[in-house]
Amino acid sequence: MTFRAQMLDTLTSQSSRDLEAQALGLVPIVVETSGRGERSYDIYSRLLKERIVFLVGEVNDQTANLVVAQMLFLESENPDKDISFYINSPGGSVSAGMAIYDTMQFIKPDVSTLCMGLAASMGAFLLAAGAKGKRFALPNSRVMIHQPLGGARGQASDIEIQAREILYLKERLNHLLAHHTGQPVERIARDTDRDNFMSGDDAQAYGLVDQVAHKRP
């Protein structure tokens, strides 16, 4: 078995397990027939062959590792061909989301992002982090930005350490979001003070996406 086949088998198996758990086991299987016989894929792994990566559900270490692995694999396959990153996520862990973000900026292929359903919190941040001119939202999708959430427990000194960290993350995320949207940092800070929901058109006007996609071009 070639390295490519081994890598695809590994990603297929892992993505199948993760996405089946998210969808309560209701993941369609695609069967392809060739001269060498039949081969089955879960639908997400089949779409991976078309360079489509999904972020579905919460952003956590498990989903981030899966997304990062798929992006690195697709870069190794063809560093000059775009990757399509479809997002339907309420957000989640900042550190897990930053692992995806840094990978998007690190790899050679442009990453085109598309919001379907909801891109909230870290999901919205990753949506905005796509390649300029290649960030899309579907007409009835929703986008929500806000400041990072956190809860501090323990001794007073521990709470102080955690408070400094979340304030650092808030400032860092605000500056990165300002970079990707073209908005002043001061406006980002003001607009993310509370949950801020937007339509696709609002997200386009704000600079989170470049276009509301009604039909495939």
Swiss-Prot record:
It catalyses: Hydrolysis of proteins to small peptides in the presence of ATP and magnesium. alpha-casein is the usual test substrate. In the absence of ATP, only oligopeptides shorter than five residues are hydrolyzed (such as succinyl-Leu-Tyr-|-NHMec, and Leu-Tyr-Leu-|-Tyr-Trp, in which cleavage of the -Tyr-|-Leu- and -Tyr-|-Trp bonds also occurs). Gene3D superfamilies: 2-enoyl-CoA Hydratase, Chain A, domain 1. The keyword Cytoplasm applies. Its main location: cytoplasm. InterPro entries: ClpP, ClpP/crotonase-like_dom_sf, ClpP/TepA, ClpP_His_AS, ClpP_Ser_AS. Its EC number is 3.4.21.92. Disulfide bonds: none annotated. It is found in: Cytoplasm. One of its GO terms (molecular function) is serine-type endopeptidase activity. GO terms for cellular component: cytoplasm; endopeptidase Clp complex. The active site is at S121 (nucleophile), H146. Pfam families: CLP_protease (PF00574). Fourteen ClpP subunits assemble into 2 heptameric rings which stack back to back to give a disk-like structure with a central cavity, resembling the structure of eukaryotic proteasomes. NCBIfam families: clpP, PRK00277.1, PRK12553.1. Belongs to the peptidase S14 family. Cleaves peptides in various proteins in a process that requires ATP hydrolysis. Has a chymotrypsin-like activity. Plays a major role in the degradation of misfolded proteins. This is ATP-dependent Clp protease proteolytic subunit 2.
